């Protein structure tokens, strides 16, 4: 094979001497070795490129609360399938989600308020969850709490959905000043767990704290349910990886309490 290779390139590649135990490259052989190493690298890169071409991309965006409390177990379930899919996850505001979908930077997205008004996009409910009242484990709130009995000075406000804010203004007034304003339930860990502290939280987020750090009650006059919407490009079918992800999401949501699924 070596002689055939030398005949093909038209020059000796090895120095041959009787009794020599080690092979020595000629000057042409040294150059050929360098070329061969480059060819090997190119071949490896070509194989890697072919592998990448076989992997699909699934690009998903969601608002902060959805990405923090709802989707992480679904991401885990989807990745455990070991599909030839690279998953891209983005946390975006509704307005940024709209632009990213229209520019084909996303396959689909989830928003938590129906504020998208564009004929090029389709918005449909994905699931619905009620708001529950969370308080310290040793609090004495009844199983059903009248909002009129709550002290807004003991509240941690974490929800900024327009419908929730209208409910809040109706019960506590537009000038109400809660104890703490935040965008995550984790901020509750900064507060001393005094008996009267409370927060209105979506059911799925509340479930992560039941028993461990909070007691859960219902409202006699609750805020409007929190609805998550699936946003896609109008008239464009979802890819097989996207459909499989939604299937995993549906399975996860059906196992949750207090959640109505529309997928």
Pin down the residues of each PLM region:
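Hydrophobic hinge/microswitch elements
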Residues: 93-97, 102-105, 112, 163-217
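Secondary-structure junction motif
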Residues: 141, 145-175, 238-246, 256
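Central regulatory/effector-binding core of bacterial HTH transcription factors
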Residues: 55-117
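Short Pro/Gly-enriched coil loops immediately N-terminal to beta-strands
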Residues: 122-135, 148-152, 219-227
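C-terminal effector-binding regulatory domain of bacterial HTH transcription factors
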Residues: 166, 203-215, 221-263
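Short, well-ordered beta-strand segments
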Residues: 57-61, 109, 156, 199, ...
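A short LG(V/I)-centered, amphipathic sequence patch enriched
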Residues: 6-25
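Alpha-helical linker/hinge and terminal dimerization helices associated
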Residues: 8-9, 32-53
């Amino acid at each position: 094979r070596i002689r055939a290779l030398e005949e093909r390139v038209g020059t000796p590649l090895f120095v041959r001497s009787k009794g020599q135990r080690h092979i020595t490259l000629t000057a042409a052989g040294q150059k050929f070795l360098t070329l061969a190493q480059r060819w090997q690298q190119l071949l490896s890169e070509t194989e890697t490129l072919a592998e990448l071409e076989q992997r699909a991309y699934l690009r998903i965006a969601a608002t902060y609360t959805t990405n923090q409390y709802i989707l992480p177990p679904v991401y885990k379930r989807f990745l455990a399938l070991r599909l030839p899919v690279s998953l891209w996850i983005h946390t975006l505001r509704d307005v940024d989600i709209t632009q990213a979908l229209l520019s084909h930077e996303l396959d689909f997205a989830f928003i938590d308020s129906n504020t998208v008004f564009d004929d090029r996009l389709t918005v449909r409910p994905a699931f619905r969850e009620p708001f529950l009242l969370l308080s310290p484990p040793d609090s004495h709130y009844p199983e059903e709490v009248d909002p009129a009995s709550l002290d807004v000075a003991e509240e941690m406000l974490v929800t900024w959905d327009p419908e929730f804010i209208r409910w809040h203004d109706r019960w506590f007034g537009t000038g109400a000043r809660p104890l703490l304003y935040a965008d995550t339930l984790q901020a509750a860990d900064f507060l001393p767990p005094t008996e009267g502290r409370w927060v209105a939280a979506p059911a799925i987020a509340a479930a992560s704290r039941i028993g461990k750090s909070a007691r859960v009650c219902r409202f006699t006059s609750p805020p409007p349910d929190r609805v998550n919407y699936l946003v896609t490009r109008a008239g464009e079918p979802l890819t097989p990886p996207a459909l499989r992800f939604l299937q995993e999401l549906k399975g996860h949501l059906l196992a949750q309490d207090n959640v109505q699924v529309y997928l």
